[in-house]
UniProtKB/Swiss-Prot annotation:
PROSITE patterns linked: AH, PDZ
SMART domains: Arfaptin (SM01015), PDZ (SM00228)
UniProt entry tagged with the keyword Hydrolase: no
Domain characteristics, as noted in the entry: The AH domain mediates binding to F-actin. The unoccupied PDZ domain is probably involved in allosteric modulation by forming an intramolecular bridge with the AH domain leading to a 'closed' formation. Binding of a PDZ ligand, such as GRIA2, allows enhanced interactions with F-actin and the Arp2/3 complex thus enhanced inhibition of actin polymerization.
Name the UniProt record assigns to this protein: PRKCA-binding protein
A single BP term in Gene Ontology: glial cell development
Job of this protein: Probable adapter protein that bind to and organize the subcellular localization of a variety of membrane proteins containing some PDZ recognition sequence. Involved in the clustering of various receptors, possibly by acting at the receptor internalization level. Plays a role in synaptic plasticity by regulating the trafficking and internalization of AMPA receptors. May be regulated upon PRKCA activation. May regulate ASIC1/ASIC3 channel.
PANTHER family registered for this protein in UniProt: ARFAPTIN-RELATED, PRKCA-BINDING PROTEIN
Post-translational changes noted in the entry: Phosphorylation at Thr-82 appears to inhibit the interaction with AMPA receptors.
Recorded GO MF terms: actin filament binding; Arp2/3 complex binding; metal ion binding; phospholipid binding; protein domain specific binding; protein kinase C binding
CDD domains (alphabetical): BAR_PICK1, PDZ_PICK1-like
PTM-bearing positions, type Phosphothreonine: T82
Amino acid sequence: MFADLGYDIEEDKLGIPTVPGKVTLQKDAQNLIGISIGGGAQYCPCLYIVQVFDNTPAALDGTVAAGDEITGVNGRSIKGKTKVEVAKMIQEVKGEVTIHYNKLQADPKQGMSLDIVLKKVKHRLVENMSSGTADALGLSRAILCNDGLVKRLEELERTAELYKGMTEHTKNLLRAFYELSQTHRAFGDVFSVIGVREPQPAASEAFVKFADAHRSIEKFGIRLLKTIKPMLTDLNTYLNKAIPDTRLTIKKYLDVKFEYLSYCLKVKEMDDEEYSCIALGEPLYRVSTGNYEYRLILRCRQEARARFSQMRKDVLEKMELLDQEHVQDIVLQLQRFVSTMSKYYNDCYSVLRDADVFPIEVDLAHTTLAYGLSQDEFTDGEDEEDEDEEDTAAGEPPRDSRGAAGPLDKGGSWCNS
């Protein structure tokens, strides 16, 4: 466009250096090398690579990248040609084709502008919105917003809640079993003391046997605690290390994804701006000066897409391993728990079945005398009533009357009233 005015405009490279080079690519079965071309006459003084497609000769070779300028095909200059003419030149060559290029030495940090940062924030907000809400607010949703890994993250949160509940329940259960074992130990101590003090041999042996049974149950409880406690450690390891690590990886993946989507949206906006100017017939400065800003964004988009693909692959592998570990671990822990509980109850039943000593015959009178040797003779009050009746029959006042004090006479002696 500016050439029609009678003068040329120098390319505005934005301080980005370029390095010339050439690469020979072997075409695939469809006679393609796997690149898309942009720029060219009549609006842009140079032609450049817009995108390198995956699993194509250009992508597998890795020499050229998005944003690189194409200067020739098989030694023929393409200056002043349109992108359609250059595409035909490449298609006419069979087998191997040599591409001459100027490598764009771009720094991805140059493309990380405030606009990209704001777009990342917008994508974060739109991520958790429904389509209706986003449309009502006038926010566009990128194609990757409904990502399956986000749902996997929600499943991971539910799994974390499951493990947290199991951990708390196991802690409470272990605490209850510890208190129960201490109760059995106290029972054993009490019955052991009773058995030692019991004078009758048969009853003493029965109490001691019953005490030993409770002490055995206490040992079974301690063994259960030692067996199940590692289960609690494994659950905490999965809950506090594996799940947070995966959650952090997914958050990093989402950050890379939002960055890639931001560059895609930026490219779309710049394309729309260019098409609008072409439709109006007005020259666009950045296009007429080599479109280096657009090519920088193309390079940033390609690198962001590569990071996004690699991060997505890593997250999928980690999620798969975590799911397998979850299935295997939960089955192993539940089997350990059930087998330990079953063994505990079977052992308790076996011990109590062998300790079936009831009913126990105890001589209460003999036991009372044996336990009361160090105490005074026991009286129930009936003997005192008998003595009072005998004193009354002999003409003596009862003890209550004798013990009562009368008023004093004038001489200071006691008298009976």
